[in-house]
Amino acid sequence: MDLLSLITGKKFEKHYSKVGSRFSDESLNGLEKQLSNGADAAIDTTADDRGSVVSLGASLPLSQGRPAKSKNILNDTLLAEDQYLVTWDGPDDPLNPRNWSHSYKWWIVIQVSVITIVVTFASSVYSSGIIDIASELHSSIPVSTLGSCTFLVGFGVGSLPFAPLSDIYGRFIIYFVTLLIFTIFQVGGGCAHNVWTLAIVRFFQGVFGSTPLANAGGTISDLFTPVQRTYVLPGFCTFPYLGPIIGPIIGDFITQSYLEWRWTFWINMIWAAAVIVFVFIFFPETHEDTILDYKAKYLRKTTGNTAYYTIHERERDPKNAMIQAATQAVSLIFTEPIVVCFTLYLTVVYIINYINFEGYPIVFAKYGFNKGEQGLSFIGVGVGIVCAGLCTPFIYWHYLKVNKKRNGVICPEDRLYPLFIGCFLLPISMFWFAWTCYPHHIHWIVPIIASAFFGFSLLIVFFVSYNYIIDSYQHMAPSALAAATLVRYSASGGISMVARPMYLNLGDHWATSVLGFISVAMVPIPFIFYRFGKSIRAWSKNAYKL
């Protein structure tokens, strides 16, 4: 048995014993007897070209229910009659992630959130040591900034392969293996003796750290219905942004202390290693096709009958899946107005966010903040992000109200309401910050309050854009989100190289104002798609038509 099967198979058996009925020898022996004797009292039979086909619903709790997915309708019809096809045991199958308890689902979301904080923390903590890195490794500050750039580009590149790989091999194994490799590359960062090694190591940290960003949406969709996702996704989305905010807060105190910049890598390595152990012990498989594969393996192992199978096992083709995912993502980003516009919006807020990691220390150093206090200046953004997350119940209540009013028929455009506020708060917060950061005339708390409104709008833009893309493209949403992730992180990585020169050359006021003017250009997007979104989706070859 290979390592993957050993890990996932054992976890499946352990998890099955918790959430569903155990297999009993009596039921399995009874099933084999019924199959051999053709006991019509317990099972239904349907004739096909091989003789009799048996539905196992009355005999085995792992065999019947909602059919597995297939792209071939005729193939679905034939396979649905196959006695050895393993599917759900009805709509209430306890192994179906949608049927797990609400508390257990949230426990899984918390685990994914912790993984996300670990990797996004790494994206920004590096910026705290750039000046020290330049000094110790005899490099310029712009060249030392390259490590931030390559990490973000790696984030974007990694989003393309890991989403389809998790659909092939399951969520757990992808989370576990990539987080393990991410942790190993922290050692390379801590031991680096030149900036080019740091840049390469940081790139691979980004690639293998991108998994929660690429797969979290899929994990949440495994567990929750679209209506439930209205409150789950905003709650989760606080963590991809809190990680980068925590980075400079902790990083500035580390580099200011006797520990020096290398400990930004060692701290990340220790934290990530602890999370790996946590994930290995507690994280279950949530991908439904993979769970069905484990069911089939369990049946083959327990009964000794190798005929049991799933559609996913027969149709699995990693090479074609990877090619299809990449070509689909590229196609969507160039041909779909919804993907193009909301990717642009996400890219703008990400660029602003990562420019702030370079700009805030410059701004607040003029207030007399020491290095540790400069990191604390990001608390305002964090407070705004948390406040946006706390608005989730009100957004969910509104969505339920619309859902009830329309008898369960709701449009993707109904997701856009929160952005009607967020789209204005973003430029307001930028101009507020730009023209109140006067150290000798205005107290530092005023721009900090402005940064809180930026954090609020940041989260609103993120979860509204994600929900709208998911609802608009449904089965193609992973490719659309992967394309958005690639573009926004690659662009953020490139722009981060010019953030410090921009603030030094333009000054605090105009550098921030430039970002404010760019965000003003994004204001019409939610209103345009609220008015014309349905027509745009009707025109599209790929979008969901209501």
UniProtKB/Swiss-Prot annotation:
GO molecular function terms listed in the Swiss-Prot or TrEMBL record: transmembrane transporter activity
Entry keyword Glycoprotein: no
CDD domains associated with the record: MFS_Tpo1_MDR_like
Keyword Plastid: no
Transmembrane parts of this sequence: 106-126, 145-165, 172-192, 231-251, 263-283, 332-352, 375-395, 416-436, 444-464, 510-530
Subcellular location per the Swiss-Prot or TrEMBL entry: Endoplasmic reticulum membrane
Example of a GO cellular component annotation carried by this entry: plasma membrane
Membrane topology category: Multi-pass membrane protein
Keywords: Endoplasmic reticulum, Membrane, Transmembrane, Transmembrane helix, Transport
Pfam families per the UniProt record, alphabetical: MFS_1 (PF07690)
A GO BP entry: transmembrane transport
Family the UniProt entry places it in: Belongs to the major facilitator superfamily. CAR1 family.
Protein name per UniProt: Uncharacterized transporter mfs2
Originating organism: Schizosaccharomyces pombe (strain 972 / ATCC 24843) (Fission yeast)
Lineage: Eukaryota, Fungi, Dikarya, Ascomycota, Taphrinomycotina
Gene: mfs2
